[in-house]
Design a protein with these regions (language model features):
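Short, solvent-exposed aromatic-acidic interface loops
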Residues: 150-156, 219-222
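Conserved protein-kinase catalytic-loop segment immediately C-terminal to the catalytic Asp
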Residues: 139, 206-207
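Short secondary-structure junction motifs
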Residues: 109, 200-202
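Structural motif
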Residues: 144-145, 211
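Short secondary-structure transition/capping segments
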Residues: 157-165, 238-243
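Active-site nucleotide/adenylate-binding loops and adjacent lid/helix of ATP-dependent enzymes
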Residues: 1-134, 139-142, 148-154, 161-188
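C-terminal active-site "lid" helix and adjoining low-complexity regulatory extension at the edge
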Residues: 177-184, 188, 192-200, 207-243
Length: 243
């Protein structure tokens, strides 16, 4: 059965439909679990060279690093944010370790992704330096949006490394309201993706200096969904609240 949650599955199908970060995909048969025991797999040097080449195609560091299934962005500076290529091996180690620990059977890590860092205007920082900016998650089923939400629920930051101190709640509230024009744009782009792929998907959108970019997707039934309330909602023109 095809692994449709793997970025390598869905990205080639949607990259020409909506704005997405420049992306390089590296597949490997390297037995990476061996690095957790302090050993270098036979294919290690070749894999690292392939990753370096991918980074070079994007103009070098800094880049966004992830597997086909996770970035573990809550450990930002130790995992997905690669500031210097000399730290590539350690970041790969950290992502492999995290992937092995997720749930009971872990996550696959044969697919590796290098992406450009999109220009954003953060309102505060959390999770070891991760820039927090406006993001929304849309759910699309059979080509129609049936739910949308701010990406970040407030409880995500209660135990974070935020340097915003007491201001973070106010700042989060400000970026958690979506204007009508943006909702119309994101709905249209999400439904374009949904019609192209079919099925039920969650689609994540990030506001950048270039506009809205689609950054991630996953099977809708397996994606985190929450109901935004109060100041997170803005009335649509016809008086219907955002779901």
């Amino acid at each position: 059965m095809e692994d449709i949650t793997n970025l390598a599955y869905w990205y080639p199908k949607v990259k020409h439909l909506v704005p997405t970060p420049k992306t390089e995909i590296v597949e490997t048969d390297c037995n990476l679990i061996e690095i957790l025991d302090g050993e270098a797999p036979n294919e290690w040097r070749g894999f690292i060279e392939d990753m370096r080449v991918a980074i070079g195609r994007l103009g070098g560091c800094p880049v966004f690093l992830r597997t086909g299934h996770t970035s573990n962005k809550h450990e930002w500076s130790d995992t997905c944010y690669l500031a210097d290529v000399k730290d590539l091996g350690q970041h790969i180690y950290n992502l492999v370790e995290f992937s092995e620990c997720v749930d009971m059977i872990g996550l696959p890590y044969k697919t590796w992704i290098v992406r450009e860092l999109l220009p954003v205007k953060p309102v505060f920082y959390a999770f070891k330096g991760m820039p927090i900016t406006q993001e929304f998650r849309y759910f699309v089923k059979d080509g129609e949006v049936d739910h949308r939400q701010p990406y970040w629920p407030p409880e995500a930051f209660l135990k974070s490394y935020s340097n915003a101190e007491k201001e973070w709640e106010k700042l989060l509230a400000e970026i958690s309201v979506l204007d009508k024009v943006s909702d119309k744009e994101l709905t249209a782009m999400t439904e374009k993706i949904g019609k192209a792929l079919g099925g039920y998907w969650s689609v994540d959108w990030l506001l950048t200096d270039r506009g809205w970019y689609m950054t991630d997707m996953a099977e809708g039934a397996m994606s985190y969904k929450w109901q935004a309330e109060g100041f997170y909602l803005e009335k649509l023109p016809e008086g219907k609240e955002l779901e």
